[in-house]
UniProtKB/Swiss-Prot annotation:
Binds 1 [4Fe-4S] cluster. Its cofactor is [4Fe-4S] cluster. The keyword Metal-binding applies. It comes from Malacoplasma penetrans (strain HF-2). InterPro entries: Dihydropteroate_synth-like_sf, IspG_bac, IspG_bac-typ, NO2/SO3_Rdtase_4Fe4S_sf. NCBIfam families: ispG_gcpE, PRK00366.1. Keywords: 4Fe-4S, Iron, Iron-sulfur, Isoprene biosynthesis, Metal-binding, Oxidoreductase. This is 4-hydroxy-3-methylbut-2-en-1-yl diphosphate synthase (flavodoxin).
């Protein structure tokens, strides 16, 4: 079985979630609500957690957000990260209000005296700080001297880290996000060679669900396959639940996340012998809320169908009005095409019950 080998980094705790070390890649997202609307923000956090998100970041943009931050933390089912830009006082307020981690941007928080206050408080509370560099908000002097490059991003990170370390703080997570996929890959590879701190990876402002998924998969897939990355956010325009779904599928495709039903199906070429598309859609819908490891193959011709179906936990190879159903590598029955969906659902439900029962026993 193919397996992605992970690079080992220092480990840090974000609340009760550990990032780095020998731990799995942690999935995170960011709310799209106004933070001062506590009810809506907490509701969205809970939705994200139900989908499989482990850490949630929320924006602290103004006094209202800062005042509401503690209420969000109190009512959240997961650790909350404060996203801070421009005003260092909001970082202090967020830490005092129970932030499990703070994200700071070297491009817009530069006052060393204020940074030392943040560092001291984070040390007392034993919470990590993410040094979050972004290609779109690099310090002006680096823009002039280096342009928007991986070297400029690395210098910005090093400045912050040097300040933090000189003040006795090493509870650090690092990110170097860029909208350009190749730039992000280069920056993260440099960081992986330079630092032993855990890396938060992402392609910033990646775009819509379609475009952003492609860009993120291209960039983050390369990094993850090379063992780089300890926590991940896929930035998409729109519903943050989509970010979590794409994260899970990307990690699953690299063998880094198994709590997912993996459905494989034909590309519906000219060899297809039955109406496959509605079957795939129905089974995807049926398994959407089932978070457990299962491989389901839905195939429609005699060329690859039987072989692929045998490799799955459950599979069908259909054609000419009937389908052969496979379970655990063996053909178990042949059923009419109009009964395929119901038969698949029954078998999947049995597997899901077995999984849930096994979890209860533990």
């Amino acid at each position: 079985m193919y397996k992605t080998i992970r690079e080992k980094t220092k480990a840090v705790y974000v609340g009760n979630v550990q990032i780095g070390g020998n731990n799995k890649v942690v999935i995170q997202s960011m709310t799209t609500t106004k933070t001062h609307d506590v009810e809506k923000t907490v509701a969205q956090v809970k939705e994200l957690v139900r989908e499989g998100c482990e850490l949630v970041r929320i924006a602290v943009l103004d006094d209202e957000d800062a005042a509401a931050f503690g209420e969000v933390v109190k009512n959240s089912p997961c650790p909350i990260i404060a996203d801070i830009h421009f005003n260092p006082l909001y970082a202090i307020k967020a830490i005092e209000s129970g932030a499990a981690k703070v994200r700071l941007n070297p491009g817009n928080i530069k006052d060393e005296e204020q940074l030392r206050k943040i560092i001291d408080l984070a040390n007392k509370k034993n919470i990590p700080i993410r040094v979050g560099v972004n290609s779109g908000s690099l310090p002006m002097d680096l823009m002039k001297s280096h342009g928007v490059t991986a070297d400029a991003m690395m210098i910005a990170v090093k400045r912050y880290i040097n300040l933090f370390e000189s003040n006795g703080f090493n509870n650090i997570v690092v990110s170097l996000k860029a909208t350009n996929v190749l730039l992000a890959i280069e920056a993260y590879k440099k960081a992986a060679m330079e630092f032993n701190y855990p890396l938060h990876i992402g392609i910033t402002e990646a775009g819509s669900l379609f475009n952003g998924t492609i860009k993120s998969a291209a960039g983050l897939g390369v990094l993850l396959h090379e063992g780089i990355g300890n926590t991940i956010r896929i930035s998409l325009t729109g519903d943050p639940l989509s970010e979590v779904k794409v994260c899970k599928k990307l990690l699953n495709s690299l063998g880094l996340y198994d709590n997912l039903v993996d459905i494989i199906s034909c590309p519906t070429c000219g060899r297809l012998n039955f109406d496959l598309n509605p079957v795939v859609k129905e089974i995807e819908k049926f398994t959407r809320k089932m978070n457990f490891p299962l491989k389901v193959a839905i195939l429609g011709c005699a060329v690859n169908g039987p072989g692929e179906a045998k490799e799955a936990d459950i599979g069908i190879a259909g054609g000419n009005g009937t389908g052969i159903i496979f379970a655990n590598g063996k053909a178990i029955k042949s059923v009419p095409e109009d009964q395929l969906v119901d038969e698949l659902k029954k078998l999947i439900s049995i597997k899901y019950k077995e999984y849930l029962d096994s979890k209860k026993d533990k």
